[in-house]
Amino acid sequence: MRMKKVMITAFLVLVVLMGKAQVQPTTTLLGSWSGKLNVGTVSLTLVLHLDQADGYVLITLDSPDQGAKGIGTFKEYLSDDSLAIKVEHLGMTYRAKLKDGKLDGTFAQNGMSFPLVLTRGDVAKPKRPQMPAQPYPYATEEVTFRNEADSATLAGTLTWPVGYDKSSKKKPVVVLLVSGSGQQNRDEELFGHKPFLVIADYLARQGIASLRYDDRATGKSVGGKLMNATSLDFMRDASAGLDFLRLQKKFSKVGLLGHSEGGLIAFLLGARKKTDFIVSLAGPGVKGDTLLAAQENRIMSLSGLPANMTVEQYRQQKEVKENPWLQWFIDYDPAADIKSTRCPVFALNGDRDCQVIASQNLNAIRQLLPKSKKNLVKEYPGLNHLFQHCTTGLFLEYGQIEETISPEVLDDVAKWINGLK
């Protein structure tokens, strides 16, 4: 689950700063340099930019695999064939010398050092072969709906199935897509991937409509508090989306598809209002503190670090106590809401998800759901939190993987929805 917490790693922290290296007005090292930082089983792409402006050379660092751009650096030394920079807030340094046309150096952070060779040129734009290309064979409609309780207006895209539009007399099934934690646009975009766009496109080609929306105060959505907001606030946004779809009187069924925190929100709603079905993509099935302690230990273990975090130790961390969203989440146990959900549920996860551990959460959901032949709980081998085929499941891989979402998952979701009677 892409939780609003700081994952403890030995890698770059996502902090954006700006800094100028005050040096001679030119250097032969001007331009972009890129390479891979190999740390154990993880490979992290780094890009160094040296740009000249107003008699200064500005040096910034990108970490595209982490979604970080423009990390400012402070110059310790810079010449035509060598450089030394640091990012003090991150405890990071890089010292390199030009050798055979490459910057051959050492990257160090928090007492650990690794070789890092950079070659001229920026990294190529990542390939995303599942990205839908226009013109689409289906109709789309820009819509807004209102959460009056929180004074929030949510903007989104209603995607009609192939052969349908708002004038059609036949009523298709529609799915409201609810994103994971953190403010995201309607496509749930991250690292160049647009999972919700890919899902909406696939569903439309299988006869299923969908509505995806920008999270409150994001994209074209306006209003609604963010300060001190919790999943209950975001639940009301999704609830307004369900109401909007039902008021159209254009759909035979109105269901929810939630990813990560969106799966939690789906069960919150499933226990409280009419919902025709739920698809929970890597949604929680256990109490928040239990989930996050397990998440922390899985990430630490995969990173080659000690994995001995207890639930109580997690709860005592400073960032937990100072974050209202996180405080609500660790105290929330979804058991009662899952037990009270009477609609059909398809709960799925990948066995390499290191954010919402599949075995822990799917087993809980399976035991808690009311008995129904329509329910399906499935664990997919080799898939991560985004349902990509992966190596380790660590979040640093997300942007490096070309696949946005497993075709098997897309097919299973569409077939399950279409199989509901």
Language model feature labels by segment:
Residues V23-K99, D104-N110, Q130, Y138, ...:
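Central antiparallel beta-sheet cores of small beta-barrel/beta-sandwich binding domains
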Residues V123-K170:
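N-terminal cap/lid segment of alpha/beta-hydrolase-fold proteins
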Residues Y164-Y202:
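Short, surface-exposed "cap/lid" segments of acyl-processing enzymes
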Residues P195, M227-Q248:
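Alpha/beta-hydrolase active-site loop
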Residues L268-L269, K273-S340, Q355, K371:
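Accessory cap/linker subdomain of secreted extracellular hydrolases
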Residues T341, A347-N349:
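Short beta-strand/loop motif that positions the catalytic acidic residue
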Residues C343, C354-L368:
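Short alpha-helix in the alpha/beta-hydrolase fold that links the catalytic acid
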Residues L386, T392-K421:
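Catalytic active-site module of serine/aspartate enzymes centered on a nucleophile-bearing elbow/loop
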